[in-house]
Amino acid sequence: MSIQSGEILETVKMVADQNFDVRTITIGIDLHDCISSDINVLNQNIYNKITTVGKDLVTTAKYLSAKYGVPIVNQRISVTPIAQIAAATHADSYVSVAQTLDKAAKAIGVSFIGGFSALVQKGMSPSDEVLIRSIPEAMKTTDIVCSSINIGSTRAGINMDAVKLAGETVKRTAEITPEGFGCAKIVVFCNAVEDNPFMAGAFHGSGEADAVINVGVSGPGVVKAALENSDATTLTEVAEVVKKTAFKITRVGELIGREASKMLNIPFGILDLSLAPTPAVGDSVARILEEMGLSVCGTHGTTAALALLNDAVKKGGMMASSAVGGLSGAFIPVSEDEGMIAAAEAGVLTLDKLEAMTAVCSVGLDMIAVPGDTPAHTISGIIADEAAIGMINSKTTAVRIIPVTGKTVGDSVEFGGLLGYAPVMPVKEGSCEVFVNRGGRIPAPVQSMKN
């Protein structure tokens, strides 16, 4: 395939002017060989394995970034869900395991480590429950550990006992961490994927290799610039522009991933195509939708525009890589997207509209600040609604919601860095407490019967 000089200049502009970057190189590490009935031995085994497998990740990323001139923003680690790994200890708390993950991740210099997780879509083992109840204290006493809970799937339905506990866990975490910041490191999933490189929801699935490299790219600014500079008039033409741009973005990510795999001698897993925004101007998914013809993100037509964007990104990315996986779509995290923040502050982008948008994109209600007095059962209800969308549509959905203690609608909260800031958004006045407290399981839908 011949490369034109114009295409080379396009790639240079992507990095220099349009905020293109490789968002993360994530090493997934299997911890099954660390299992011990003694929690102290387990912690030592975990520390040793992470610091051995991941020791060269940061230096490799810096080398590749310099070699190719492409920023590689984060280096991360994901591990096997700790509820599985710590079960043999029969401990009544896994906070020490979270602290070990934190210590190991800091020792090798990575940005985040994910996998303080439990998969409870069909039921909770004693270990799962211990882990979930350990999350608030774990988030309070660690800095870069991320946690996730998978409470439902298309095949299993929704575990409402776990949904209730997840809502209480988020609420408790908000109460004991400054401005609820610990909740920014907790994701509650339906249909969680095993090869996600993005935080806070990354964990290393049990069906994965001993270690694997997963890469996430980010290029909302590139897509917006491509639309600004194109002569596309119809939405068919808009989709074509997005598709071609996604192809170019993906090729860069594929190159970085394969090179990292070779240098680290770890198999290349997947490339996640997700358009991941940042709070920086010019790096917003919302502004892409507005470029398509919306006056403000969140107005009528937003869900349709997002569906077009998400599908075109996937089509372009799939052509560029044979290893597409993870979440692969367009993220809509309110606090991490300058355009979403503006739309929410204007009162146009609401929680209800965001929920509708999650039906057509990845991944879910993300980085949304709500009043600090929001009850736990309301958080559980929001989680259940989002899980239902994922369950029925056979897609990954998730909730990362932050009840901000002492704040109410009209206030805003600053998280800093890539997490940005967010206006506090209202939740519904009515109560779902009786519904949530019923417990049990919402049965798997008829779509689950595929054999």
Curated annotation (Swiss-Prot):
Q: Which domain of life is it from?
A: Bacteria
In terms of Gene3D superfamilies, this protein maps to: 3.20.70.20
Checking SUPFAM superfamilies in the record gives: PFL-like glycyl radical enzymes (SSF51998)
Return the Pfam families for the record. DUF711 (PF05167)
Subunit details: Homodimer.
Family the entry assigns? Belongs to the UPF0210 family.
Q: Which NCBIfam families match?
A: PRK05313.1 (NF003700)
Q: What is this protein called?
A: UPF0210 protein NMB1652
Species of origin reads Neisseria meningitidis serogroup B (strain ATCC BAA-335 / MC58)
